[in-house]
Amino acid sequence: MSKSVYLDAFQEVFVLGMRNWIKFRNFAQILRLTFIPSRMKVLKFGGTSVGSAERISHVARLIVENGKNIVVLSAMAGTTNTLVEINDYLYKRNIPGAQETLNNLEMKYRGVIDELFDNEEARAEAARVLGERFAYIRTIVASEFAVAEEKEILAQGELMSTALMNIYLKLHGVKSVLLPALEYMRTDQNGEPDMKYIATRLRRLLEANRDADVYLTQGYICCNAYGEVDNLKRGGSDYSASLIGAVVDAEEIQIWTDIDGMHNNDPRYVDNTRPVGSLNFEEAAELAYFGAKILHPNCVLPAKLNNIPVRLLNTLDPSATGTVIYNMPPDGKIKAVAAKDNITAIKIKSGRMLLAYGFLHKVFETFEKYQTSIDMIATSEVGVTVTIDSDRHLAAIVDDLKNFGTVTVDRDMVIICVVGDLEWHNTGFEAKAVSALADIPVRAISYGGSNYNVSMVIRGCDKIEALKRLSDSLFE
């Protein structure tokens, strides 16, 4: 009988960051006693939510309706991708390509300004502020491009979206104050949030602006330990909101997107999906890690450790219930199915070495050597299968693993993850999940390492059919 072991990504993050998070909780308690006048909410709006003049105006109304809170904004939809494209041109020394792309982006923003502002003075102010941002990018394009400047270019999207929103709110009589993320959001030498620095700097900014109606700040962007502009990686605006929420001991963290919360399956492929009303933090972390794009995986931990509910809401339908994530007790239910694409499965077969002392340790050391994370691992008496989601160092990894046995590689695989209350005494759920895929080839199954998921590795071409069958079996 084969044995299956699940490498719980959430637990891994928890262990690696615990020392910093313990410090962070202490800072949150200090802040609660010293300067936060009342518990605010942290509202994060993603790129699609502020993707046009019409949507910026709509989000502004939502901001005002929610009262005095901290609002975290992403860049307007498409902006970060365009800035990445500009960086690619600069790496290739294609200056004309970078200039043309930048000009097109500026034209887009000019159109947004013209549509958003009917007041000439506000329109001129917006044009001036955004003009400064585009002029700054042009100085980089015209100079000898350095690697450090890549992140400075990427930061401009959030700086522009918050500038537009700030001007728009003030035009409509709202005392909006910008909290520049580059003045308080910092990572340490390990790339982890610098808790003491964030708490201290953010406290000063809030104290200096006590009478504000609304606090606006940028998601995603930060400075590193050396004072250079950096970021929290794609999707990092959720993480920014969660870190801020923990610092101010927020009443609630709201993540606003263009969908009604976390669905029980992928609505792009499966009909009649429905929002999941509530999840506990562990379930949410599993779904976020294994493919639910609505929430960044790193967002969960700060909220969990500070017991702050996270609510997923729809900008286009604010009255929709959405999903609330909190420390809810186990309820014995399957909550949702998610899929993680672009997985590579690697099998090492070696009957002679597998059971030898230290064999698995050597396998793991290989992946550590190339800084490649493992999503799943399943072992049997004669082989071990691991999955990874990055093939950047695949050739080198495979060469090293050949020292331990025969290596086979399957690319274009998918991890299907069934999430819910899967405590061992809640019998039958895992059987229903596996039997639903009866005639779909399953490369590996992982169950037992987490109380909240059962994961199966299948071919990418079988993903949609697998999602539909699981939906029929588990939710009908």
Model-derived segments and their meaning:
Residues S2-S4, S38:
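Serine residues within intrinsically disordered or low-complexity segments
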Residues A285-I325, G332, A339-K347:
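A conserved active-site cap/scaffold subdomain adjacent to cofactor or substrate pockets
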